């Protein structure tokens, strides 16, 4: 260390240490302020969550609220206007049975609407890229070539060949009986249908509750309709039909609502009873996947061959756990599900993003060189000690532009003879160009040399002295290069 330089070095070292040591001390406080996010907040499907992710529904919930209003209003009118009269005239068991049916209907409805129907998690970017490469190899195409459309796998279930289709949105091969819901934008295991009346998909995890809901609602609708008619008949026997309607106007509204809804509800319950007894889904029945019209060899491989067994499996079997941890916390290194690309390979997309990043780094590196060259090169010392000057390392330059090979510089139009120049000739020129910015020896750019990132660089303490015409021409060329780069 040269004498007298201890003070500046200490200041430099102190400022450098204080700059780097302050950032780690601030990071823990910043992390404490940021609350941990749960997975339901970044769920890729079109769903709505309530109660911190405990309740999961579809976004289209308008018809669900209509279902709630119809059930609550009809049942409330029945308990308020019909049950008091029927409990006195017939039996107190009528309001008790109606209450049990009502609570059972509401419980199964909410259980169906608020639960996970069996959503399958989407593939992560790494899983999707690996699967895309497997498909490319299986189809005999390279990553940049055209891939033929068939994306299916075939599995054998109880002697029946079942095709597994590839989902371009979830980036997975759907398991048997699974399908993608276009409204919720999720692949649902054992997908039955999307029911707007319950505001959710009906799948493997909530099908039994859906069936119990429509079955109990059928009993409740028939029960209310029957005893509303009984109430009107008993009153009409005492005071006449018109007076009976005037005494209990709510009974008319209940009878109309029940009359128009009982047929569809009872019919839907009967249809799903048939599906359960044959171990089918609504989706399979509509598509005719296991229809007898396709031949005797086309049979349902999921049926146990016994109606009682099929019903027990559908209604009394164990409920599979949810495959999406919607209330779990997001880890910093947890990969997010892959975004849909409509058939474009993730490998190609990742490669193109890497190429764009490399191009941006190269452009930034070239900008640094041109910005340094744009400043006129003037130095008060008229001595020349080296033919090669080294460019100081830039901390922002990274791979793949870590090594820069600079082309040979364009010789100026006129080069002054340094042997004949004197200090008296140089100083007036310096005074004439006070508007220019002068470079220190450490900031001067170097002539051509392969510079490796991270290697120690030796800096020359002497510079070439250029003439006025050379400085102006170099300045103009550098400005043109910067203008061209800014348009990239």
Curated annotation (Swiss-Prot):
UniProt KW Transit peptide keyword: no
PROSITE patterns, A to Z: DHHC (PS50216)
Membrane-spanning intervals of the chain: 61-81, 90-110, 209-229, 256-276
Reported tissue expression: Widely expressed.
Catalytic activity annotation: L-cysteinyl-[protein] + hexadecanoyl-CoA = S-hexadecanoyl-L-cysteinyl-[protein] + CoA
Cytoplasmic side of membrane: 1-60, 111-208, 277-488
Membrane topology, from the record: Multi-pass membrane protein
Keywords noted in UniProt: Acyltransferase, Endoplasmic reticulum, Golgi apparatus, Lipoprotein, Membrane, Palmitate, Phosphoprotein, Transferase, Transmembrane, Transmembrane helix
InterPro entries in the cross-refs: Palmitoyltrfase_DHHC, PFA4/ZDH16/20/ERF2-like
Location in the cell: Endoplasmic reticulum membrane; Golgi apparatus, Golgi stack membrane
Domain DHHC as annotated: residue spans: 165-215
Domain of life from the UniProt record: Eukaryota
Active-site residues, Swiss-Prot/TrEMBL: 195 (s-palmitoyl cysteine intermediate)
Biological processes per GO annotation: peptidyl-L-cysteine S-palmitoylation; protein palmitoylation; protein targeting to membrane
Residues with the Phosphoserine modification: 455
Family to which the UniProt record says this protein belongs: Belongs to the DHHC palmitoyltransferase family. ERF2/ZDHHC9 subfamily.
PANTHER family assigned: PALMITOYLTRANSFERASE ZDHHC14, ZINC FINGER DHHC DOMAIN CONTAINING PROTEIN
Protein name, UniProt field: Palmitoyltransferase ZDHHC14
Organism whose genome encodes this protein: Homo sapiens (Human)
